[in-house]
């Protein structure tokens, strides 16, 4: 079972995303900001971090730097597509527009986690 951290300041969105992912057999932890995520969790223990771009305090892209070994999927509104591209340049593994389509979110998560598992297996075989 894969572990996912959802960082979203809007409780309704955070809860909906958690339920969606749990229905697909993911273990989900939550935080409402970057600082809360860092204080409550070891970011390297997750297979994926899904974060809103605009959060109170620091932007979601700060998690890319703080969780260098964990892929970060950025969620953004349609109005901030330019910010999504900038997030990718900073190292986000992908972005998804809000409001997100449930099937698209699950497919994106599955793809990222499968890709990460393959990369980890390859790295272990090289050692």
Regions found by a protein language model. Name each.
Residues 80-82, 96, 100-110:
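C-terminal output helix
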Residues 11-29:
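Two-component/phosphorelay signaling modules centered on CheY-like receiver
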Residues 14, 56, 80:
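The feature encodes the CheY-like receiver
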Residues 5, 30-48:
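Acidic, metal-coordinating helix/loop segments flanking the phosphotransfer/catalytic sites
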Residues 52:
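Active-site residues of response regulator receiver
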